[in-house]
Swiss-Prot record:
Belongs to the GlnD family. It catalyses: [protein-PII]-L-tyrosine + UTP = [protein-PII]-uridylyl-L-tyrosine + diphosphate; [protein-PII]-uridylyl-L-tyrosine + H2O = [protein-PII]-L-tyrosine + UMP + H(+). It comes from Aliivibrio fischeri (strain ATCC 700601 / ES114). This is Bifunctional uridylyltransferase/uridylyl-removing enzyme. Has four distinct domains: an N-terminal nucleotidyltransferase (NT) domain responsible for UTase activity, a central HD domain that encodes UR activity, and two C-terminal ACT domains that seem to have a role in glutamine sensing.
Amino acid sequence: MKYLSPLSLSDTQLNITELKQQLTLFSQYQINAFHQHKAVSDLVLERSHYFDQLLSRLWQFFKFDDIANTSLIAVGGYGRSELHPLSDIDILILTENNTNDAFCQKVGELVTLLWDLKLEVGHSVRSIAECIEIGQNDLTVATNLQEARYISGNKELSHQLKLKIHSDSFWPSELFYQAKIDEQKKRHSRYHDTTYNLEPDIKSSPGGLRDIHTLSWIARRHFGATSLLEMSQAGFLTDAEYRELLECQEFLWRVRFALHIELKRYDNRLTFGHQASVAEHLGFIGEGNRGVERMMKEFYRTLRRVAELNSMLLKIFDQAILHQGEQDDAIIIDDDFQRRGRLIEARKPALFQARPDTILDMFLLMANDSTIDGVAPPTMRQLRTARRRLNRFLCEIPEAKEKFLQLTQHPNALNNAFSSMHKLGVLSAYLPQWSHIVGQMQFDLFHAYTVDEHSIRLLKHINKFSDTTNRDKHPICCEIFPKIMKKELLIIAAIFHDIAKGRGGDHSELGAVDAYDFCISHGLSKPEANLVSWLVKSHLLMSVTAQRRDIYDPDVITEFAKQVRDEERLDYLVCLTVADICATNPDLWNSWKRSLIADLYNATQRALRRGLENPPDLRDRIRHNQQMASAQLRSEGFTQWEVDALWRRFKADYFLRHTHKQIAWHASHLLRHQDKEKSLILISKNASRGGTEIFVYSKDQPHLFATVAAELDRRSITIYDAQVMSSKDGYALDTFMVLDQNDDPIDEERQQRLIDQLYDVKLNDQATHIKTRRPPRQLQHFNVKTRMEFLPTKTGKRTLMEFVALDTPGLLATVGATFAQLGINLHAAKITTIGERAEDLFILTSDVGGRLDDEKQAELELALVKNVARLSS
């Protein structure tokens, strides 16, 4: 059944039931046309025309034509004739001297009918004078009025409004331009000034549709151009720029149209929950998340193109509107470039096409002169043209290679040159591999940025290591980085560390090959190329070891040190690792990770200096810890006899797994603890190893770990590390290293409350029912398969279990309860959250104290998969 033109509907058909049916038929027709690849520009215009007809027919039905001096006008996006399935329909009822009760009732009936039809209608009833007065004081109203379009009623009244709106007295173009620039800056800052947000807003994100609208609004206000085509015809856009903006708009419109098909309520955010379905609507298919990643790659690339054009054209408008007839004097830099104000400018119109290597010269000059903070619009245009006409990558030009290497060696290049090269598409023009990662995203909660944006942020974080004001946040890197002799090797490794992502296979291995070839082709020595290649191949090694291995086990340190080999490689690796973590997600780096990386670095440095053939004597370590702790305890008034009597209850492992300060702290409170049968819970007053330490002493119970983990989870406290051990006489000596929901140590005010809450929990309860928090909204859109891998330890007496699952609230408590149900002993836990994934390490033994046999491993795997599935259901 085909929809009818609203103009053809009789008065009897203008009822809720019939109109709803007609709207449904029209919407379904548009959805079908969209899936049959009808141009989305035609669809949004067609939708606008349909509602023009519907409103005109209703205007006639309610007899507004009988009222003099009244006009129905579309404003805002509807005024531009751009309507998507869930777009607001903004209308202005323009009237003069018609505000009596009968008129107001008629307006109310019209609007109520539209609302009953479930249409998102925004309406206002104003005179011309009211429009002008309100518009002069409200930029949004002024912008909407600028796009006013006549629909029905008194045409002359609509024309009079347009004359008033487009007069200079309404909004002088200089003020309008500045107001729109300020508005865009504020909008961009809400999205962290990047086109790469995990759940971007199609309309408002930098590079989104609003950036195109801003260009149109300014051009309309100052130049009288009512469309991109008119801007091109007036010479403010080149034909190529016009076609590119049109192409970008068409793609963004298709994404928005597809999103609106999926939604029930108006929204322009491309959330995780809708990315897959939108990708399917647009024909992006692939195994797993490949379809989503392909669509988002095109989406981010489109935002980049819009953002680049927006930046360049606004600079042109700035000159034409604010500085017409004015121009800063040119300060000649060399034969090819000059500085005009704070912008660098090519002195010859076809410089980049004639000598493409001079593109790199421009960025070297920007690095040399901190007063230059951008590229002049004509030079940006020249660069864009030259970039598209290159018949080979810049890295194939010998002169360009030399200049690129100079940039990696320049102390100021990290600060702005590389990010500017990326924004202006020069890194893609230089490196073929870089062009493949532009806009490359990963469908997860861990990586906050696309691969290219992450790599640029990594370079900026490396630059922070040379600033002593960052010493508190990055003590080791700020100490090491200034001493690294060949910083360019670290820079090249940073550029290449993720460059092979999206190709399939191990990106570290593939990137290492690319990095080696790059170094050799750029004249670096083989030892230098080998170092860079090793850094790329091993860029995850330190992070994984610190977060997912027991770095207080000498065997782990020895194995890590063997892979690193020498202190020079260790210094390069720690700088790359820390910058990589910081650039992955702004919330990832915290005091706990800083402590882990520092402990691993220091332990490895000691091992390398001692020599790997001379491992530490564990008995010496136990003696050292006991002697230092004894001295502290004696200074507090305890006798050596009291201390020795307590420690005789503890196993040797306790003195290896804790520092002498922890041992003294535990003993000091245990010796004062009179009732041996009663539990004791301690919380460190000061942050230890980057987190808050919770110590639990209690009669040992199988479910103790699970009970404590469940209670901490309910309080939004995250366990990062746990040491689970017992005394010889059957008492638990469990240590939990925790952070709050903001990844900060627990503040003192909350510590006593937390102790009371833990005491209130019956520590001998069997945690069969685990109360959990509501999972975050985004988790429901991810499916992480629960899996585990069992690894033998060096001695063969314990089992290491690597565990991966969706990071659902209550997960750790569920795992602990499963261990208890199966009679499996937990000795230590390393907890790592990578976005939506939990990647944890557990050290386990059987109920009789040995490693888990194959049968027990299979039983545990089956139980964990079942229990975790129940938790997520």
